[in-house]
Swiss-Prot record:
Pfam families on file: pre-PUA_NIP7, UPF0113
SUPFAM superfamilies xrefs: Pre-PUA domain, PUA domain-like
Higher taxonomy: Eukaryota, Metazoa, Chordata, Craniata, Vertebrata
GO MF terms, alphabetically ordered: RNA binding
Annotated organism of origin: Danio rerio (Zebrafish)
Name this protein carries in UniProt: 60S ribosome subunit biogenesis protein NIP7 homolog
Amino acid sequence: MRPLTDEETKTMFEKLSKYIGENIKLLIDRPDGTYCFRLHNDRVYYMSEKILKLATNVSRDKLVSVGTCFGKFTKTQKFRLHITALDFLAPYAKFKVWVKPGSEQSFLYGNHIMKSGLGRITENTDKYQGVLVYSMADVPLGFGVAARTTQECRKVDPMAIVVFHQADIGEYIRSEDTLT
């Protein structure tokens, strides 16, 4: 387990800023202590500095996971967010999409959100902006990327895709063996 390099930190923070904007600072300097990001086996973990000190007593080859997995770096050094980061990103989300109850299940199975399933969308959402997807009861369901701006969503055909699927809480079941 090691600290992220400058390039890795820049790549990860660019990805996080698509979803939570400048609120990244609030992830690091929290009222309950200082938190940090560490890399282990191409996965980025988010943990308190207390847990970090305790984890140094475990050898690298024996350490499976520590803290919360925020995502992983691909072989081409792109950063992919994991669904395990949802609980930390949801309170700070800048752009949100609410899904109608009939389309929740479709999204949780890994499908994109159609206009017919769109309940609400945050004003001034840009095209290809990272959004957090919520149920109409304000329960965070996952991440997505806006396929259209807020204004385009109002005029588009009901079967057009408005949010591209990135990750959802159904992955806890579908990918339970690969989430660490």
